[in-house]
Amino acid sequence: MSCQQNQQQCQPPPKCPAKSPAQCLPPASSSCAPSSGGCGPSSERSCCLSHHRCRRSHRCRCQSSNSCDRGSGQQGGSSSCGHSSAGCC
């Protein structure tokens, strides 16, 4: 085995690219429409967005108390959160 092959095997795996907001969004679905606050059918009471939780009002709320990026203009406790440095809030 050549030195070049050894070096290739010893290289660390590539870092994962930063997630874009598009990657964080769920697939298009009528139950995830913005008008429903991103929530699923009322019978399921599930939230289509990760790190969110649907409440009785069927609006998704961020579980995390961390605020989102200032550029999004949304805070962590709002019903429509932006993209935080740690992923989707």
From Swiss-Prot:
Pfam families: LCE. Skin-specific. Expression was readily detected in adult trunk skin, adult arm skin, fetal skin, penal skin, vulva, esophagus and tongue. Not expressed in the cervix, rectum, lung, colon, or placenta. InterPro entries: LCE (IPR028205). Signal peptide: none annotated. Induction: Induced upon stimulation with inflammatory cytokines produced by T-helper 1 cells (IL1A, TNF, IFNG) and T-helper 17 cells (IL17A, IL22). Interacts with CYSRT1; the interaction is direct. The gene is LCE3A. This is Late cornified envelope protein 3A. Belongs to the LCE family. Residues 1-46, 62-89 are annotated as: Disordered. One of its GO terms (biological process) is defense response to Gram-positive bacterium. Keywords: Antimicrobial, Keratinization. The keyword Cytoplasm does not apply. It comes from Homo sapiens. Residues 1-10, 17-46 have a biased composition (Low complexity). A structural component of the cornified envelope of the stratum corneum involved in innate cutaneous host defense. Possesses defensin-like antimicrobial activity against a broad spectrum of Gram-positive and Gram-negative bacteria, both aerobic and anaerobic species. Upon inflammation, may regulate skin barrier repair by shaping cutaneous microbiota composition and immune response to bacterial antigens.
